[in-house]
Amino acid sequence: VHKAKDFLAAKGYSLIMKLTDFKAAELLDAINTMSRIHVKCLLVVMDTEENMSDQLISAMHRSGLPIMLITSKYYPLLEFDCIHLDEYSGIIMGVQHLQKRGYQRIACISDRISLSRVTVFKQAMKLQGMKVDPQLICVGPERAESGGYLRTKELLSLENPPDAVFCCYDQMAIGAIHALRESGLRIPEDMAVMGFDNLTSSKYIEGGITTIANPYEDMLSVAVNILTKRTKNPQMSQQQIALRPNLVVRHTT
C-alpha cells in the first residue's frame, strides 16, 4: 500500500483505497463506489479467479475509467490493461527445489481462497514426475496461521505423513512451523516447509522460511506507469504483462 501511494504521488496522484477482503461482492461494490465518486483511474488487485465474473467485467466497462488489473492469472480476452503474476513458474520452481533436496512425499496446504495455487501445485508435481497423493492435499476454511496450523496437524495424523509441505502462502507456512515444533519435529530434517509470497516476516521465522518471492514492487511500478499513461492517452494499445517470481532459499528446506 505504501509503495503504491509513493509511486502514485510521484506521478501527481493521490491514493483512495477500498479493501475487499477477497470477496466478490465487496470487489463489485468497490468498483461501483469508485465510479460514483469520480476517481481518475482504477487499480484493481484480484487474488482469486472466482472474482472475475461477468457482473464485475460489466461494472468495469460501465465505469468508463482507465483500469489496470493485477491478477494471478492471464486473461487474454479482457479489454483492460493487466499485469499478472506468473504463479505457475513460481510453484514449479518450488517443487523442483524440494525434489532436488530429496523430498518425495510433498504435501500442499491451502485455504479455499488460494485453490488456484493448489491446482498449479498438482500440475507441477506431475511435470516433475512425482506422485500426487490425495491425502497430502489439505484444504480447509481457516485462513492464515490458524489454517496452516490445522492443516499441518491433519497431515501429521496420517499413518504415512509427508516429508515436506508446500504452503500456498507464507502465513500458512508460519502456522505449519508452529504445528511441527509443537509436535517435536525438526525443520527441515523431519519435514521441510515452503511458503509463497516472501512476506517481510518470513525471513525472521525459524531462521527464515524458504519461499517464492513475487516482484510486488516492480509490479506496482509498472502498473502505475501504464495506468497514468492510459489516463492521458486512452487510445494507447492494450498492455498485458507477466512478471515472474523468484525462489528464496532459507532454513526451512
Predicted regions and their residues:
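An alpha-beta-alpha
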Residues: 92-128, 135, 239-252
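Short helix-capping segments at alpha-helix termini
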Residues: 8-11, 63, 126-132, 157-161, ...
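Alpha-helical recognition/docking segments in bacterial nutrient-uptake
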Residues: 1-96, 100
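Hydrophobic alpha-helical segments within soluble ligand-binding/sensing domains
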Residues: 81-108, 119, 123, 145-154, ...
